[in-house]
Amino acid sequence: MQDARRAGIAIVAMVRSSDNLTTRALRIIPDRLIVHNEIIQNEASSLYGMKAERITVVGIPHYDKYFRGPTVPRESFFRKIGLDPRKKLVIYFPICDYRMRENVVDRMVIETLANLDANVVVRFPPAESVTIAGLVKPPAMIFDRPGYVFDERIYGNRELTPEDDERLLHLLAYCDLVVAGPSTAAIDAALFDKPLLLVDFYPTTLAEAEKIYEYGTEHFSPILASGGARRAKSRDEFLSRLHEYLTHPELDHAGRARIVEEQCWRADGRSSQRVVAELLAALGHEGA
């Protein structure tokens, strides 16, 4: 971007995630900025002084394919990856190590979910560490570790494949509950109208600074305010909410719809087309 600015070349930038403008920063202000939703649009204006006419809201391009839905029937998909089609499915997206000074949560949650009479898939992040040292994988639980590894010696040197993304689409489409921390998994769950249970309890008493910090961040506050997720602050509450959601998946439907409206802006599967249209406009090819 620096070289482009020096050379007088127009810069079109895109915000790739909901936390980019508040937990990171724009060092160079582009000529035009593409964003997912009006929340990020307002952040670009209030935090960076960008004029509204230089910001284009397009939705979330990554979700375009999700609107077509699964291509493999539920029973066939379950059997393919080793799940029992007769049982419900819970997906756990780990908290990850970087969200705490010491990750004492992920192992605790996995051990708790192992006692469920349900299918449980732990969907690990492709490029973040998750400490579960000493944990023996429960036999009825699947550990899904996505990503093509480029170099085993460098942690995180991997990239999601189309097959990884397709598997996630099917897991989300067919699951009955999503358990997660303050991550984009909350939007994933809402997009498929799946109950969302947020983990905010710990095996021992911790100081506030040692807990999961992102629940207090600006980018996650709209999720908490939406009414589309329950935040468990004790093991008993976690188990109670878990069974409540599995019995009544319709709970908090309106809140999940609000998450989709606020975070995805348009749920029409055409976000990528709007990105292309913006780039063509920047090149002077409007309507091409």
Predicted feature locations:
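C-terminal alpha-helical cap of glycosyltransferases
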Residues: D268-A288
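Hydrophobic beta-strand scaffold residues
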Residues: I9-I11, V120, L196
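Flexible glycine/serine/alanine-rich "lid" or loop that lines and gates the nucleotide-sugar donor pocket
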Residues: R6, A173-Y174, L191
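Conserved catalytic-core segment of nucleotide-activated headgroup transferases in glycan assembly
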Residues: Y63-R158, A232, C264-A267, S271
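Acidic donor-binding loop of glycosyltransferase active sites
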Residues: N157-D164, L169-S183
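Catalytic binding pocket for nucleotide-activated donors in carbohydrate/polymer assembly enzymes
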Residues: I28-P30, M50-A52, L177, T184-R266
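Active-site and donor-binding regions of nucleotide-sugar-utilizing enzymes
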Residues: M1-R68, C96-R99, E128-S129, R167, ...
